Curated annotation (Swiss-Prot):
Keywords: Capsid protein, Host cytoplasm, Host nucleus, Host-virus interaction, Inhibition of host innate immune response by virus, Inhibition of host interferon signaling pathway by virus, Inhibition of host PKR by virus, Interferon antiviral system evasion, Metal-binding, Outer capsid protein, RNA-binding, Transcription, Transcription regulation, Translation regulation, Viral immunoevasion, Virion, Zinc, Zinc-finger. Heterohexamer of three sigma-3 and three Mu-1 proteins. The RNA-binding form is probably a homodimer. GO terms for cellular component: host cell cytoplasm; host cell nucleus; viral outer capsid. Coiled coil: none annotated. GO terms for biological process: regulation of translation; symbiont-mediated suppression of host innate immune response; symbiont-mediated suppression of host PKR/eIFalpha signaling; symbiont-mediated suppression of host type I interferon-mediated signaling pathway; viral life cycle. The gene is S4. Cleaved during virus the endosomal proteolytic disassembly of the outer capsid. It comes from Reovirus type 3 (strain Dearing). It comes from the Viruses. Stimulates translation by blocking the activation of the dsRNA-dependent protein kinase EIF2AK2/PKR, thereby inhibiting the host interferon response. Sigma3 prevents the activation of EIF2AK2 by competing with the kinase for dsRNA-binding. The viral outer shell polypeptides, of which sigma-3 is one, impose structural constraints that prevent elongation of nascent transcripts by the RNA-dependent RNA polymerase lambda-3. Disulfide bonds: none annotated. This is Outer capsid protein sigma-3.
Amino acid sequence: MEVCLPNGHQVVDLINNAFEGRVSIYSAQEGWDKTISAQPDMMVCGGAVVCMHCLGVVGSLQRKLKHLPHHRCNQQIRHQDYVDVQFADRVTAHWKRGMLSFVAQMHEMMNDVSPDDLDRVRTEGGSLVELNWLQVDPNSMFRSIHSSWTDPLQVVDDLDTKLDQYWTALNLMIDSSDLIPNFMMRDPSHAFNGVKLGGDARQTQFSRTFDSRSSLEWGVMVYDYSELEHDPSKGRAYRKELVTPARDFGHFGLSHYSRATTPILGKMPAVFSGMLTGNCKMYPFIKGTAKLKTVRKLVEAVNHAWGVEKIRYALGPGGMTGWYNRTMQQAPIVLTPAALTMFPDTIKFGDLNYPVMIGDPMILG
């Protein structure tokens, strides 16, 4: 596990979405660009050049910086400088048991797939296996908003080992079969490349850069499809009103968009990236640097786009403002049951009965 809370990439995404465009970012590996393939060190925002590690202003647009200047952040973050974000034990325990139930059942179903069924899905598209949310760990607190954190937990021996084994095996099955799951994040460098979407979009090679104005969003697997709509300005057909975790629940994935080990169960947001290990890493934010005035605009834009409830559920009390203030103060973040009361019920977060599937997205959904 890498990063659970928003990191440099995700801050770039947030600002891209808030300002409906792509901002220039700087990485030591790639220099200035509008792509987000490398860890960003600086970005241009609101007429200022901002350090992505402390959100302090380090220069202006007129002075195009060629490297991250020395400032009070002095950002050459070392691994030993990372801050551990610890999750409450019972939160982790409930989550891991839910995950184990999910991956074990999906693995068993994939094992039962016949070669004929696999060939049919490869040729015609569609769903290969489906797992209904209601089949996942009926005793988990994540099943119902009325469940209690103190409810009895099933004892599972070698829980971490089993989780790792099942998840790894499931990934291998999916990759070896060239299938697309709708429940986990994939490396955006190959997520849609060459995938048959049907219609005019068949075999379209999509850009590897993030574009908030596009109907296709990187870093997550699309898990719902609607009608194709043709945009002459784009020169291709695309899916209108795509439902993606990035747009619906915020992008709280892993750093560098690496594959998450957190599936999206039904329409439940995968915001607990660190739950499978009980902790995650985040960059330390150094006090004393000039704060980014744009943060307030950004918070307002994100709250408007996603809704306060979703933000609070994802980041805990205080939402994004609270997260920003806590990290700027370098305070250890402990997620407790009280911080996770915003369970995504059917009213706020859609139908939890939504199935999770593996198959070809040509007619998936």
